[in-house]
């Protein structure tokens, strides 16, 4: 996920972006000509766009609120399985802080492997990223008693990743799923979920 992108992948991404923007501009121009302002079709299109913006803003506000609630010191434990079903258990400690509005940081140590780690994630201008790797928030909802349910997804050079989390006051339960993209990395294997739990805050 953190590997440097190749020149071709960057050029490919730029080509897709330019093509997409050009298509969107022509499509919008043609749609505006077919549906002049004030017509029922144009009004419906504007209503859909406004609704989409409102939903994105609501999801972003929910996501920031849920992450802000998790600030503090945590112990964590969990296990993950490779495509062959071999399980590895892990545990550690970390501290979650807010670097700036909408940006968060976790510093900790994996006690099982005796290695330290640092992750930074946040949202800016409607775009989400962790350690400069973009991701999407597919769902965020605030449940009873101030609990949250979140679904995040992203695609890297090695595969697709989905992260589902239940945030409560004294614990966080994460279920992660990874699907490799290449045959060499067992592309035929289905999603193999693995669990991580943030236990009661360190006293």
Q: Where do the language-model regions lie?
A:
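Central antiparallel beta-sheet cores of small beta-barrel/beta-sandwich binding domains
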Residues: 59-60, 64, 75-164, 194, ...
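Bacterial N-terminal signal peptides that target proteins for export
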Residues: 1-11
């Amino acid at each position: 996920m953190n590997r440097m992108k190749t020149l071709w992948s960057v050029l490919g991404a730029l080509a897709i972006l330019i093509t997409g923007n050009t298509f969107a501009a022509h499509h919008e121009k043609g749609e505006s000509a077919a549906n002049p302002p004030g017509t029922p079709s144009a009004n419906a299109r504007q209503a859909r766009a406004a609704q989409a913006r409102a939903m994105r803003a609501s999801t972003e506000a929910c996501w920031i609120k849920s992450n802000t609630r998790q600030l503090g010191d945590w112990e964590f434990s969990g296990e993950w399985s490779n495509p062959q079903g071999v399980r590895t258990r892990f545990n550690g400690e970390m501290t979650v802080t807010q670097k700036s509005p909408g940006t968060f940081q976790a510093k900790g140590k994996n006690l099982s492997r005796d290695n330290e780690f640092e992750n930074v994630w946040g949202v800016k201008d409607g775009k989400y990223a962790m350690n400069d790797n973009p991701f999407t928030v597919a769902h965020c909802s605030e449940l009873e008693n101030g609990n949250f349910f979140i679904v995040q997804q992203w695609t890297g050079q090695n595969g697709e990743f989905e992260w589902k989390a239940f945030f409560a006051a004294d614990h966080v339960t994460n279920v992660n799923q990874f699907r490799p993209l290449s045959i060499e990395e067992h592309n035929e294997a289905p999603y193999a979920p693995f669990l991580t739990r943030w236990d009661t805050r360190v006293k």
